[in-house]
């Protein structure tokens, strides 16, 4: 490496060693958040930053007129080391509150609660009690609160052992169990509920301990009290206003009707059938300004990606259109995949447009999906029933709870449009959202951030392990 290259490398190293002089949170114009690159916290969906914790911290920054800067740690020990070294104002990464962490850092009020779950692979020996964890190959994420839990349990169960996987997250330890490279792991319920869609053979065997609060952690120093107060006021207001619940729905959703068998079948089809249709779906989705994964999930729910599918009721094609609907949408050949996808996308976008303007996402898409399968009139009946029962007709979870009433013989005769398969509509929407979630998660491993290069290894031998001069 030439002298110019070494100088550039030195500048790069020094550029990364920032954070020691961060202004206090209450005075800062930029919020520096330390987090992890995981599906439940922070990730890139294409070129767009996303994730529940990212969205929550962005909301904090916007409310306080601050810029947001994200710094990613590649392990939990590194995350807390960065916080201890003053490299960020807060650590926000789905962090369970624990005595060990509380001794080192200041914890906010909880913004979620989660349960530690012992996870195994279906078909293998299921652990039914804590004693069943002994003499098993148990893996956990290094630096996690689960290590603290196990260390505490080891006092009464001295034969309990485990392996700690470094620079990993729950997705990776779940993959180890799924691939038979470990027997058991421990994963928090929030992450398990989302990530099980990628590993449908994995099952929660038992709960470990009580539910634990999920908190933001701040440095424990003289400046932490006003900063902690600022964070706590924000989190309390987000709970009270419903903003927190809205973000939970947006990022975690509801998947009550999704079966493990359905997930396995979907994943097999995703590998065998989807590749031949993906580019066409992406093109149609671009034409109609949709996410291709939503369109693909709809097409799978309708026909399992079979362009020649036909039902006993006469609906046909990839999007299972009726003859009447196809004619209204200008679809000449329902068995032509491109025509069918365009017809379905056009119909869905029209339903999305016709919904009241004050229905926000993600509820808007879920309601349009329900209308796609039972009709806008029946959806409106369910919204009216929701409002009459004291629910919010703008929120999908509330409307979802009332859709089955359209089958109740004591209720549907009094609605404007009468009987409808409300239970079927609920399952339809849940399945599509579930399949869309799998497609989203499948795209994440290729877009996850890579750990930093070990710069020391690139330096000439006489410069390794020595402080670099300031230029």
What are these model-derived regions, one by one?
Residues 367-438:
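Catalytic and substrate-binding regions of cell-wall glycan-acting enzymes that process beta-1,4-linked
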Residues 18-95, 99, 103, 163-167:
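Extracytoplasmic small-molecule ligand-binding "clamshell" domains
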Residues 35-38, 110-123, 189, 193-233, ...:
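Periplasmic-binding protein-like
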Residues 92-104, 151-152, 175-210, 380-381, ...:
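A ligand-binding cleft/hinge motif common to bilobed small-molecule-binding domains
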Residues 255-305, 338, 355-359, 444:
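Export/targeting segments at the very N-terminus of extracytoplasmic proteins
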Residues 17, 51-63, 122-146, 189-193, ...:
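Extended ligand-binding regions for polar small-molecule ligands
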Residues 32-41, 45-62, 96, 117-169, ...:
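Bilobed "Venus flytrap"/periplasmic-binding protein-like clamshell domains
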Residues 142, 308-332, 337-350, 408, ...:
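Substrate-binding/active-site groove segments that recognize
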